[in-house]
Swiss-Prot record:
InterPro entries tied to this protein: Beta-lactam/transpept-like, Peptidase_S11, Peptidase_S11_N
Ranges in coiled-coil conformation: none
Descriptive protein name: D-alanyl-D-alanine endopeptidase
Organism phylogeny: Bacteria, Pseudomonadati, Pseudomonadota, Gammaproteobacteria, Pseudomonadales
Catalytic residue list: S66, K69, S123
Amino-acid positions noted as binding substrate in the UniProt annotation, renumbered to this chain: K230
GO BP: any one term: proteolysis
Cellular location(s): Periplasm
Species of origin: Pseudomonas aeruginosa (strain ATCC 15692 / DSM 22644 / CIP 104116 / JCM 14847 / LMG 12228 / 1C / PRS 101 / PAO1)
Family classification: Belongs to the peptidase S11 family.
């Protein structure tokens, strides 16, 4: 009888627990799934509040390729050197330029303004190298100014060794580059030059003209409102993209680094915009995912989890 009573009590308690569990509130409905990216690191923040909207490995130190040129242009503007001064295309002080193809002829001349335009709009390496070589004190003084500016902006994990981004030793993080994007708001010419769709530039000595286009094809997409942009690529850095743009009617800073494929960084930006505006998750191609996982393993990252605040 006693054993039977104990069994009934146990059964009653089990049913009570089960009922309590089943009656507990379900997970909140409507929470969006997390968007996966093909890029190794990324960060999206609200320009007005600084709130993080999406992040993936934001403090991972990686090569940044031609994203470097944003700092190059900023240092030139800080110098207050005359923008209409005509300068020679000179690259001898930047050893990374050896063997790098360019349509721009060494020794020909354009204005400092046009050099800045070409460096930002079409990522012209000879223009960026020439800006440094025509700086007071030359390339070495210029690189010193780049690193001093990074330090002043609180870019603690950033280092520059040359002005083009060709060196794998030009490194930064998504978080540091977000600080650079924030600072760029004080330089309206950076926005103007970096978002110019295309331009024909006239060179002197000898006289010739060349047409250039923006390296970010999203500039021509009317569904995007881009205030500033810069792309970058080297084998070591992968495909990189930074933008000041508008998502969900709010101004944001967007950084994606080390993406696989010629258009993957643009696709990741589009995935992020769609997800932030609608909650819709978009799959990434298998090849792009395999590349990202391989890069993660090479860096000992395992399976980092993206985080977001929505």
């Amino acid at each position: 009888m006693r054993n039977r009573l104990l069994s009934l009590v146990t059964l009653f308690l089990s049913l009570s627990v089960a009922t309590a569990v089943s009656a507990s509130p379900p997970p909140k409905a409507g929470l969006p799934l997390q968007q996966e990216l093909a890029s190794g690191s990324a960060l999206v923040t609200d320009q007005n509040t600084g709130k993080v909207l999406y992040s993936r490995n934001p403090d991972l130190v990686v090569p940044i390729a031609s994203i470097t040129k944003l700092m190059t242009a900023m240092v030139v503007l800080d110098s207050k050197l005359p923008l209409d001064e005509v300068l020679p295309i000179a690259i001898s002080e930047t050893s990374e330029m050896r063997g790098v193809f360019s349509r721009v002829r060494v020794g020909s001349q354009i204005s400092r303004r046009d050099m800045l335009l070409l460096a930002l709009m079409s990522s012209e390496n000879r223009a960026a190298a020439s800006l440094a070589q025509n700086y007071p004190g030359g390339k070495n003084a210029f690189v010193k100014a780049m690193n001093a500016k990074a330090h002043a902006l609180g870019m603690k994990n950033t280092r520059y060794v040359e002005p083009t981004g060709l060196s794998l030793h030009n490194v930064s993080t998504a978080r540091d580059l977000t600080r650079l994007l924030v600072a760029s708001r004080q330089y309206p010419l950076l926005s103007q030059w970096s978002t110019t769709p295309e331009k024909t530039v006239a060179f002197r000595h000898p006289n010739y003209t060349l047409g250039f286009r923006n390296t970010n094809h999203l500039i021509n997409n009317k569904t995007w409102n881009i205030q500033l942009t810069k792309t970058g690529f080297t084998n070591e850095a992968g495909h990189c993209l930074v933008m000041r743009t508008t998502i969900n009617r709010s101004p944001v800073n967007l950084v994606v680094l080390d993406a696989f494929g010629k258009y993957t960084h643009f696709a990741d930006a589009t995935r992020l915009r769609r997800w932030l505006e609608t909650g819709q998750v978009t799959a990434i191609p298998a090849a792009a995912k395999a590349y990202r996982l391989q890069r993660d393993r090479e860096r000992g990252l395992g399976q980092p989890v993206a985080q977001a605040v929505r």
